[in-house]
Amino acid sequence: MKTITFPVGYRPNYLLDFLHCLRKQNLEGWEIFCSVEASPQCIQLLEICDLKMNILHKPNSIGRQDHSGARANMYNALNSAFAAGSDFNLHLEDDFLLAPDAVDLANWYYENFKDKPLSYMSYGMFGFAPRGDDYTLLEEVPFFEGLGWCAFKENWEVCYQRAWWDESLAKKYYNAYGWDWNVQAYFRDSECKALRPLINRTQHNGRVGGTCCTPQHHDKHYAPLKWNQTERITEFKIIGVGGDTADRVK
């Protein structure tokens, strides 16, 4: 089973933009799991959307009484999908915009690596600044990018499920906190590799009211980025190794 997961918070305007993008994707053969905070407007949007989704309500017992927090909400979606039998998952967020071929890239990853899932630990959608003009190209990098990524069940069990709540390596390498820093530190400690497109297949849209991103940060680091808004690619090529951790912006 192939799955798509995403958390849902309290910003219906961004959720509506995201669902508009998601509905345009090639979703044949995919199950959708989303974990929802106690946001009536967002829950209503999901229920009236004509997508078949497993809508999970996140318990309020984690974090603040009225808000479980983004990390717990994401984990609930991911863990529920893999527990339900997912072999391969595309993880997105409710304040993303998606390229027309975002799920096509996920399908390509699945078809080309389903028999060797641990070739890479992350099969990514995003890489900050574009590197060239060829929409078909992918590159190998020695780090994790969190703005849209795919993982096989084996990747989930070996890396993400273990690292998600374990702060020890993030403190050791980065003196940082958060699920993505935990995963990044696991990549560094275990010398993991990832694939990512040279031109992004996701774009951050959540300028206001996010967990970490401020309007100033969004305007500086995300708004200027080139990402695929027009092309529909179904076949991709890996060109080699590129980038370094200097590409990453937090």
Segment roles from a protein language model:
Residues 1-92, 96-250:
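Peripheral/terminal regions associated with large enzymatic or DNA-binding modules
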